Amino acid sequence: MSNFLRKKLHLCFSSSGGLSPSIPSSPIIVSNHNAQSHPHHTPSIFINNFNSLYDQLSVSSPLHRRHSSENPAGVFSTNRREEEEEDETTTSVSKLLSGGTAIMKHIESPDPYRDFGRSMREMVEARDLTRDVVADREYLHELLFCYLYLNPKHTHRFIVSAFADTLLWLLSPSPSPEHFLS
């Protein structure tokens, strides 16, 4: 890992608070004073915790269990209980994600520029950048570094292009996402 990235990695993680009580956390607890004494340990701990959160979601989800059923016909059959489980899952996932920040990771996409751009604009709209200019600039800086750090190097050109267009979209008099997706 480059020295520059190691120094800037802390920008990818919000310092405004801890985990929401509804989010399951792993037993590893990281305190702020420990992060400065061991800067090379902090990134892997955060990333492992971040990844384990999504692993727990996908494995423990009733939707995941239903699709991994040995009975292929069971995948397509629906009944009232399955619909209730799906509603509960949707509610629990939306509760889980409502207090956090989701960053799009690259998957093989026919148009990664468009996907990253849409994701960034959704993040900016959810943040409502009308507060303090310095805080907004720091948030955008953090957003860019998170996308760059969490995605492979071959996607960085799409991320930087999408980020530049997101900045232009923010600075335009009447932001229209469709204009910047072409």
Swiss-Prot record:
<keyword id="KW-0539">Nucleus</keyword>
<feature type="region of interest" description="Disordered">
    <location>
        <begin position="62"/>
        <end position="94"/>
    </location>
</feature>
<dbReference type="GO" id="GO:0005634">
    <property type="term" value="C:nucleus"/>
</dbReference>
<comment type="function">
    <text>Transcriptional repressor that may regulate multiple aspects of plant growth and development through the regulation of BEL1-LIKE (BLH) and KNOX TALE (KNAT) homeodomain transcription factors.</text>
</comment>
<keyword id="KW-0678">Repressor</keyword>
<keyword id="KW-0805">Transcription regulation</keyword>
<dbReference type="InterPro" id="IPR006458">
    <property type="entry name" value="Ovate_C"/>
</dbReference>
<protein>
    <recommendedName>
        <fullName>Transcription repressor OFP11</fullName>
    </recommendedName>
</protein>
<dbReference type="InterPro" id="IPR038933">
    <property type="entry name" value="Ovate"/>
</dbReference>
<feature type="domain" description="OVATE">
    <location>
        <begin position="104"/>
        <end position="169"/>
    </location>
</feature>
<dbReference type="GO" id="GO:0045892">
    <property type="term" value="P:negative regulation of DNA-templated transcription"/>
</dbReference>
<keyword id="KW-0804">Transcription</keyword>
<dbReference type="Pfam" id="PF04844">
    <property type="entry name" value="Ovate"/>
</dbReference>
